[in-house]
């Protein structure tokens, strides 16, 4: 059996946790499983790298030196607890070489007083490049032969859209098979950096937010793995955020489509793109707890359990509604096109859309941080006032969504949903539902989110087995 295991930053916090992760790998590797491992940076290191980039750009190299020293001490001390005598020397040497290169990168940013997307990708890559050596050392200590590789060295080839690079899946499949299959056949566990690839010019790129999970499914698809196991510090995917709903439960089974909807609408589980590489090959993804490895967690596959009409309720905070209106919009398709083209040109991401049937107005939910520039751009675009006469906003709102394949063709779901919202004294500001009937999403004032989510969770019996 061939599996890809992914370990996130929360599980790479210290020597004890990394050793625990290595034990999970070793257990399978010693049973003749072919295992590929993908790891994130140690917890908080990526944030430190981001902060150092800003410090260097602003000329504060003293802060940079202090932080590099902290990172070096943490990684060396962790290596000393994880590695045997033979691998410790090598791991220490590699760590110091990487940190020297990191210092050179930051010195360049300091001298130019500029942090380009390409430079930032290089900078952010160091977290994972440092952590793979620790995992390799821990595996060797447990009697597992392992080798470390960057995503690019493993064969993940991307475009050159630095900061959010897209994998070139056809080339990647060929390269990953060529580089990793001989390693696996030789009984070696490849430990691959999550989050990182390289473009066709061998320049390091990053896959954007959620990139480490994405790496694991890219590798699984290319290698035609049997399963992907994404290890986390929770027992799978929950029916709601347990910080909001104390009775939230683990969902045993989800479909690819359901988990993509959940991820898009705020469930902090997987990036929606994570599913894409494995969906066509029908490779299951398991979300499991590294602290309770016997717990089955959640399995994501082609079809979920349709017995439950609604599987989960999710939410996204920190949003604003921006509405464009005017009689001139009626029957003029180009107006909507101009609205979205204007927002796209200003790098404003639209989370949700709701349009009146009269076509006289369209409401869009965007992130609070984008509100000012979106409002300014739309006012400039429609300054003549002949088509769009009114542009108004509602700040501090949130989207709440219910997700489930069982909603398709089931009567009365919307009625139950909005009865639950009313019972929580929530006020629905706008609504959106796609023809797939996989979700119903709506906006409420942000301060009402918790009570609305709790009421919906109870109304659909999500706290019951």
Positions of PLM-derived features:
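A conserved regulatory-domain signal marking ACT and ACT-like small-molecule sensing domains
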Residues: 294-465
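Conserved dinucleotide-binding and phosphotransfer motif residues
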Residues: 31, 142, 281, 346, ...
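Nucleotide/pyrophosphate-binding catalytic subdomain
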Residues: 1-270, 275, 443-445, 464
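Structural motif
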Residues: 2-3, 34-37, 76, 145-147, ...
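Acidic/polar residues at beta-strand termini and the immediately following turn/coil
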Residues: 241, 289-291
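Acidic/polar loop patches that form or flank catalytic/metal-binding clefts of enzymes
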Residues: 271, 282-289
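Residue-level detector of flexible, active-site-proximal loop/helix-junction positions
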Residues: 153-155, 292, 435
């Amino acid at each position: 059996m061939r599996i890809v295991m992914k370990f996130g930053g929360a599980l790479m916090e210290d020597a004890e946790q990394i050793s625990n992760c290595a034990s999970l790998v070793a257990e399978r590797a010693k049973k003749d499983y072919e295992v590929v491992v993908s790891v994130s940076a140690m917890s908080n290191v990526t944030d430190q790298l981001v902060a150092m980039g800003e410090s260097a750009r602003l000329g504060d190299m003293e802060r940079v030196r202090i932080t590099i020293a902290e990172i070096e001490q943490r990684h060396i001390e962790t290596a000393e607890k994880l590695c045997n005598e033979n691998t410790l020397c090598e791991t220490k040497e590699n760590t110091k070489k990487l940190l020297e290169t990191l210092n050179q990168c930051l010195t360049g940013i300091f001298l130019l007083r500029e942090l380009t997307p390409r430079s930032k990708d290089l900078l952010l890559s160091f977290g994972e490049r440092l952590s793979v050596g620790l995992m390799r050392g821990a595996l060797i200590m447990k009697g597992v032969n392992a080798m470390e590789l960057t995503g690019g060295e493993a064969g993940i080839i991307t475009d050159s859209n630095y900061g959010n690079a897209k994998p070139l899946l056809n080339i990647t499949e060929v390269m990953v098979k060529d580089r990793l299959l001989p390693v696996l056949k030789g009984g070696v566990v490849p430990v691959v950096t999550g989050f990182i690839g390289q473009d066709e010019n061998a320049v390091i790129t990053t896959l954007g937010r959620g990139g480490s999970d994405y790496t694991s499914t890219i590798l699984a698809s290319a290698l035609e793995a049997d399963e992907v196991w994404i290890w986390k510090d929770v027992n799978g995917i929950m029916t709601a955020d347990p910080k909001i709903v104390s009775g939230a439960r683990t969902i045993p089974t989800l479909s690819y489509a359901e988990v993509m909807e959940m991820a898009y609408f705020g469930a902090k589980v997987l990036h929606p793109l994570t599913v894409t590489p494995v969906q066509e090959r029908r490779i299951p993804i398991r979300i499991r707890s590294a602290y309770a490895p016997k717990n089955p967690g959640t399995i994501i596959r082609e079809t979920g359990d349709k017995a439950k009409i609604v599987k989960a309720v999710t939410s996204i905070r920190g949003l604003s509604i921006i509405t464009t209106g005017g009689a001139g919009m009626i029957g003029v398709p180009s107006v909507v096109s101009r609205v979205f083209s204007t927002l796209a040109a200003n790098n404003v991401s639209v989370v949700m859309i709701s349009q009146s049937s009269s076509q006289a107005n369209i409401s869009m939910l965007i992130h609070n941080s984008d509100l000012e520039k979106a409002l300014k751009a739309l006012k400039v675009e429609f300054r003549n006032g002949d088509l769009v006469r009114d542009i108004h906003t509602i700040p501090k709102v949130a989207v709440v969504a219910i997700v489930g394949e069982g909603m398709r063709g089931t009567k009365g779901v919307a009625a139950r949903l909005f009865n639950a919202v009313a019972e929580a004294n929530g006020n629905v500001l706008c609504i959106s539902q796609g023809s797939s009937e996989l979700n119903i999403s709506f906006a409420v004032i942000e301060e009402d989110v918790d009570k609305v989510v709790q009421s919906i969770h109870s109304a659909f019996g999500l706290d019951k087995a």
